[in-house]
Amino acid sequence: MSTWANLGLQDSASPLMEQLIFFHDHALLILVMITVLVGYLMFMLFFNSYVNRFLLHGQLIEMIWTILPAIILLFIAMPSLRLLYLLDEINEPSITLKSIGHQWYWSYEYSDFNNVEFDSYMIPTNELANDGFRLLDVDNRIVLPMNSQIRILVTAADVIHSWTVPALGVKVDGTPGRLNQTNFFINRPGLFYGQCSEICGANHSFMPIVIESVPVNYFIKWISNSVNS
């Protein structure tokens, strides 16, 4: 989860998020190099008192500053396209979770099991435990197994919402009348927090998401208790 004064990205909990962080660092390095080069050229031109009166055009330099940016853009575009295709790929999911956005809470359904569905509301500040997180904790968490391919289907019942968990690198828009899907793979146990990332009304900022990642045997016990209850 995001911590106080954290200016960087959250710690990744999925392979896709790790790849997104690598791409961020790759693109940032290229941007820093361009900024330093342009700043150096502007500094030299500003303090240079010499002018070449016989320089009317420079074909070589024009070719360089046309071809070089194209090559740089290729170095950014290729890993970006690879990640876009990876984000859309569905790899034989073990579990399917359906998320429905409402004003202003989430509903969840475990499509592979009967009668496993619940609503998830934010816990108000006056009911929050001493060790709870303000505006982030919910009354019913999503419980998912680690080291398993998980598919999530996202839609909305009223207005556009967006189901987002930064640590997993997941952001899916929930649109009324449409069913969007993506997949993710949680590689460690823990609690992962997210929020609705599409302005959806007065209580938009009170729609948190909490995923509890557990080992597979604990998940099976939880599902068994949920089906029997």
From Swiss-Prot:
Q: So what EC number does this one have? A: 7.1.1.9
Which positions does UniProt annotate for Cu cation A1 binding? Answer: H161, C196, C200, M207
Its UniProt entry gives the catalysed reaction(s) as:
4 Fe(II)-[cytochrome c] + O2 + 8 H(+)(in) = 4 Fe(III)-[cytochrome c] + 2 H2O + 4 H(+)(out)
Q: Which amino acids does the record list as binding Mg(2+)?
A: E198
Q: Residue ranges, Mitochondrial matrix compartment?
A: 49-62
Q: Where does Cu cation A2 bind?
A: C196, E198, C200, H204
Report the GO molecular function annotations.
Answer: copper ion binding; cytochrome-c oxidase activity
Ranges in the Mitochondrial intermembrane compartment?
1-26, 83-229
**Protein topology in the membrane:** Multi-pass membrane protein
Q: What SUPFAM superfamilies does this protein's entry cite?
A: Cupredoxins, Cytochrome c oxidase subunit II-like, transmembrane region
- Broad class of where this protein is predominantly found: mitochondrion
Cofactor dependence is on:
Cu cation
Gene Ontology biological process terms, A to Z: ATP synthesis coupled electron transport
Q: Which GO terms describe its cellular component?
A: mitochondrial inner membrane
Q: Where are the transmembrane segments?
A: 27-48, 63-82
Q: Which UniProt keywords apply?
A: Copper, Electron transport, Magnesium, Membrane, Metal-binding, Mitochondrion, Mitochondrion inner membrane, Respiratory chain, Translocase, Transmembrane, Transmembrane helix, Transport
The free-text cofactor remark is: Binds a dinuclear copper A center per subunit.
Q: Which family does it belong to?
A: Belongs to the cytochrome c oxidase subunit 2 family.
Reported function: Component of the cytochrome c oxidase, the last enzyme in the mitochondrial electron transport chain which drives oxidative phosphorylation. The respiratory chain contains 3 multisubunit complexes succinate dehydrogenase (complex II, CII), ubiquinol-cytochrome c oxidoreductase (cytochrome b-c1 complex, complex III, CIII) and cytochrome c oxidase (complex IV, CIV), that cooperate to transfer electrons derived from NADH and succinate to molecular oxygen, creating an electrochemical gradient over the inner membrane that drives transmembrane transport and the ATP synthase.
| Complex and partners | Component of the cytochrome c oxidase (complex IV, CIV), a multisubunit enzyme composed of a catalytic core of 3 subunits and several supernumerary subunits. The complex exists as a monomer or a dimer and forms supercomplexes (SCs) in the inner mitochondrial membrane with ubiquinol-cytochrome c oxidoreductase (cytochrome b-c1 complex, complex III, CIII).
Q: What is the name of the protein in this document?
A: Cytochrome c oxidase subunit 2
Q: Source species, please? A: Drosophila algonquin (Fruit fly)
